[in-house]
Regions:
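Amphipathic alpha-helical transducer elements in NTP-driven molecular machines
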Residues: 34-38, 103, 164, 213
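Terminal amphipathic helices with adjacent charged low-complexity linkers/tails
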Residues: 155-213
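Gly-rich Lys/Arg/Thr-decorated short loops/hinges at beta-loop-alpha junctions or inter-strand turns
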Residues: 16-25, 54-58, 85, 128, ...
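Long, structured ligand/cofactor-binding scaffold of large enzymes
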Residues: 1-89
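Non-catalytic terminal/interface segments that mediate subunit docking, oligomerization
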Residues: 1-11, 16, 45, 204-237
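Conserved catalytic cores of soluble enzyme domains
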Residues: 55-179
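Generic, well-ordered alpha-helical scaffold segments in large soluble proteins
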Residues: 40-43, 78, 166, 170-173, ...
Length: 237
């Protein structure tokens, strides 16, 4: 019904996944489609594992009538119940309209593919009709607008392959649920090491500005720092 669901492992850790198929009715969300997504989120929560959504949807399949609105409500309910219990990660990999944007916005992390994905409530044609303004899909909900202006998007990927790689990396930083600890791995940095480089980064004059990112990358293990919302609210890290 336009969505493939299942489970697997990332670096040996179990995850649940659902992936919308634009080749089937433009990835629109019908009753069965919504029920499958809601069930996957619910199951992931009960098992205490992350859930990942690969989103590419034209929105609600309104020709199904009121039954679809009830089923879609179950997705939002499960998103809300799972919040704070398990990591919920959304990849926006194509145009996501209406309900295709609502559910990802309720999740913890959003990764958007540059140039090929958009998130908006209603499209350019409706904006033109109602407001008399002409906007493109990118201007309305592209990766740039959401990563730099609205702040909805946490990470931007250049293509689908990079998006999936980013998800793998992100999962590696997160606990499987609120009941577990984040994963640990061996590194080459000595916890008691001296960081002489900090003396060249932080100025003696407290009124002078300096790049806090350089400080963070010097302190963290192996210089590995995974930043979210890098281009939104640039005064914050």
């Amino acid at each position: 019904d336009g969505v493939v669901t299942g489970f697997g492992k990332i670096e040996g850790r179990p995850v649940y996944v659902y992936s919308q198929d634009r080749a089937v009715l433009a990835g629109s969300v019908g009753s069965a489609h919504a029920e499958k997504i809601a069930y996957v989120i619910q199951t992931a929560r009960k098992l205490g594992v992350p859930v990942i959504g690969l989103n590419d949807s034209a929105g609600a399949r309104i020709q199904e009538g009121l039954s679809v609105t009830s089923a879609i409500g179950k997705i939002f309910f499960e998103n809300s119940i799972a919040s704070g219990c398990i990591p919920q990660i959304s990849a926006i990999m194509g145009p996501c309209i209406g309900v295709g944007s609502y559910s990802p916005a309720l999740t913890d992390f959003i990764i958007q593919v540059q140039n090929t994905s958009q998130m908006f409530i209603t499209g350019p044609a409706v904006i033109k009709e109602v407001l008399g303004k002409t906007v493109t899909m990118e201007e309305l909900g592209g990766a740039k607008i959401h990563s730099e202006v609205s702040g909805v998007t946490d990470l931007v990927a250049k293509n689908d392959e990079e998006c999936l790689g980013t998800i793998r990396k992100l999962v590696g930083f997160l606990p499987s649920s609120f009941e577990s600890l984040p994963p640990r791995k061996e590194n080459s940095d000595d916890p008691a090491r001296a960081l002489d480089k900090l003396e060249t980064i932080v100025p003696e004059d407290m009124k002078r500005a300096y790049n806090i990112l350089q400080v963070i990358k010097t302190i963290v293990d192996d210089g590995e720092f995974f930043e979210l919302k890098a281009k939104f609210a640039r005064n914050l890290v």
